[in-house]
Amino acid sequence: MDRSATSSSSRGEVNVQRSIGGCLIAVAVMTVSVPVHGQETPAPSVFVETEEGTDIKGTFVDSLKLLMIEHSVRIAFQEKTRRELTGPFFNDYQRSVHIPRQWGDTDAWWVNYIGHPIHGAAAGYIWIDHERAAPSEISLSGRYWASRGRAAAWAAAYSLQFEYGLLSEASIGNVGLNPATNGWVDHVVTPAGAFGLIVAEDALDRFFVKWVEGHTRNRVWRASLRLIFNPGRTLSNTASGRLPWHRDGRPLSWK
């Protein structure tokens, strides 16, 4: 084969890989550009019922929306992520997926120990929202703790996909191509931190936020408190197409 044919073939392969990266960006942008519902009560969904009464379809759909939001933020604000989109997609993705060799992953401490628990809690709240029998408020009942345990398990599954799946940091940005950027910290801290943060947010919402709301009818104050003290639930609400400060049965105007 002559050099011109070889060169043309190489350029064609690179263009295909770049097209794949471009498609991923387009999907992410389209997802984020969908307007959030203006009402505080979400539209009814179609339930795929299990013995526990969980809307599996809704859980997957809203988790995909959360995934697209997170990847859109990465693409928008991380130059290193955008730079890796132009490489050989499948080859780099395959080389990026491997078992971690160390605990750390070169991320700042606040990313691993604050950011990852929040993103895990958001995934966990999506599960809770679609598990119809899950208590909405913290309590000492076994039903409450079992529901939060299942939410943490879903957060672990979501985190695994976020790290290694077809729509992951490994495929979008090639995190892990450098072995130093792949650590056990994400796989442990995300689900464990999600469980702790969900319980903490539930406690803060019931015993502090709700108490303050009982002493003021200012909607701005009420919304602000919910956003500040419940970051995981805020992100979950946004991904589910609800107002960030949404609470079931507790609109901002409650008395």
Residues of each region from the PLM?
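Short stretches within intrinsically disordered, low-complexity N-terminal or propeptide regions
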Residues: S7, A28-M30
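N-terminal secretory signal peptides that target proteins for export/translocation
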Residues: M1-Q17
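Generic low-complexity segments that are intrinsically disordered, proline-rich and/or Lys/Arg-biased
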Residues: R18, V36-A43
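Polar low-complexity intrinsically disordered regions enriched in Ser/Thr and small residues
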Residues: N15, L24-I25
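Hydrophobic alpha-helical membrane segments
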Residues: E40-K255
